[in-house]
Each structure stands twice: as C-alpha cells, then as structure tokens.
C-alpha cells in the first residue's frame, strides 16, 4: 500500500534533485536515483509507486529545473500535497502528470502512514478516515488519464480542455514537440 513521505517547509528543487545529479550529469537512466539525495538519502531506494509526498509551505521553490519533477515522475510518485507550491514548479508537476494538491496535511499524517490517493477526485484515504482534497480541474483530470499533458496532446492532437475536433494552432503544436 502506498505510504506518506513527509517533508517540511520550503523544499526546493535542489533538495528534490541536486543540480550535480541532473540528467546530463548523472545520466538519463539513473538521475532519479538521486532524488532527495541530501535531504532523505534513503528516499530513492525505498519509495514505491503511488507513494504520496506531504510538504509544508512553498514546495518546489528555487530554480525552474524540470528535471526535479521528472525524477519524481520516473519514481512513479502518486501525488504531492502541500499548503502552497512555487508556481513554476507546480506547473511543471502538472505538465508531467504528477498530481499536486494545495492542502495542509502536515498535522494530520505522519511519515510512513499508509494511504491511497485518487488523483482524479482528490480523495485521500488513511487509517483513520478520509480527506477530500480540492479535486483537480477537468483539464488536468483529462491529462492524468493519459499520463501527462504532453501524452494527452500526442494522443488527441489537442490540449486538455480544448474542444475535441478543434485544431491546435501551429504555434501551440510546435510548443508541444
């Protein structure tokens, strides 16, 4: 069963994946094994698909390096819940199909607690009950069904939330490639 990994306030992108372990430095196939290398050295070896990260305020601040959320995607993180996110990092998470919920669970759940998170509805279930997180917007639920916004675009030829049958502009299509 998925479990909680709890972090504090102001977890930055270098905490998530230190720059010296970026894909071009460590290698495309292994860079995710350095996730939280200095903050939680055991993380990459012990994290399981579907595990949920609980953070404090301002999760993902710092540089806009996309390889930090890419490492979490490669580790199959089930979602991240924090009271607030750095906006660029939040958008990178959504672009990659990593559910991110703005909600404060820091007092409710502890490291290692077993949970299930329904990314489509935002329903988080734990031993003592459930919490209804703010559900993702419809466009994101569409993207999550395909794995990410890019995968949705590749399959449907449009972005989530756009009307089916509406052609993406040349500018929009070029940006997705």
From Swiss-Prot:
Its EC number is 4.2.1.33. Keywords: Amino-acid biosynthesis, Branched-chain amino acid biosynthesis, Leucine biosynthesis, Lyase. Gene3D superfamilies: Aconitase, domain 4. Residues 157-177 are annotated as: Disordered. Pathway: Amino-acid biosynthesis; L-leucine biosynthesis; L-leucine from 3-methyl-2-oxobutanoate: step 2/4. GO terms for molecular function: 3-isopropylmalate dehydratase activity. It comes from the Bacteria. Pfam families: Aconitase_C. Catalyzes the isomerization between 2-isopropylmalate and 3-isopropylmalate, via the formation of 2-isopropylmaleate. Heterodimer of LeuC and LeuD. HAMAP family: LeuD_type2. Belongs to the LeuD family. LeuD type 2 subfamily. This is 3-isopropylmalate dehydratase small subunit 1.
